[in-house]
């Protein structure tokens, strides 16, 4: 119930800001060009801001601590491993962080290849062998080298724009049809504003769910390629061993918003269509077949 209330309030806030910006810029909301411009700004705006703040948000989300100077042998090994792999793929040394969590997990984020972050859980360092941990780190380094964070942002921006634009076009038509378009009597050309808001809200929710299928598909696709990148860096058997170890780990504790960035996604889902990660068995099979290594 709280999520629904927050969604409605957020949508109302977006609608209000949308209207204010349209008024200030003099763009007519009934203009398809104006609506598309605003949908692009709002659609990409949130994604780009999230990307620019991704390192800070990720660290705050998991309570991670960036290693400035290694304090023990484990931290020295971790820093050296990240530095070596970053050099292998030709990227600048990422920041390295550790966060406290019992599950075996790690993630990479950052707005640019040369300004990135790799974070690992204490559960990973305590429960994985060095070879397995090395493979997981290589998986995250591959995400950075492949530019997955930026590509994900672009895809999210496109689907956000689609959802905002199409929802409001249909809502505008519905409000005009059901509420009567009486612009000449002083009412908005959008028709009844309550109908417009209700239809736009419902459609944004429905289209948002459908759009998430696209972003989740890309998230799963990039996991296969990051696994393959790890196999190239440290060897196929090490990556397979790491994935097999993940099968025995705790249910990931990271927030849902972080799942797309982690190597170990949640195992349970209503449908594979909405999973950020492919099933571990499929990832292992893909490595064994060499499907993404070609």
From Swiss-Prot:
Domain of life: Bacteria
Pfam families: Peptidase_M48 (PF01435)
Entry GO MF terms: metalloendopeptidase activity; zinc ion binding
Main subcellular location: membrane
GO terms of biological process kind: proteolysis
Active-site residues, record numbering mapped to chain: 140
Protein known as: Protease HtpX
Cellular component GO terms held in the UniProt record: plasma membrane
Taxonomic lineage of the native organism: Bacteria, Pseudomonadati, Pseudomonadota, Gammaproteobacteria, Enterobacterales
Positions with a binding annotation for Zn(2+): 139, 143, 223
Gene: htpX
Membrane-spanning parts: 4-24, 34-52, 158-178, 194-214
Cofactor(s) demanded: Zn(2+)
EC number: 3.4.24.-
Membrane topology field: Multi-pass membrane protein
Record's subcellular location: Cell inner membrane
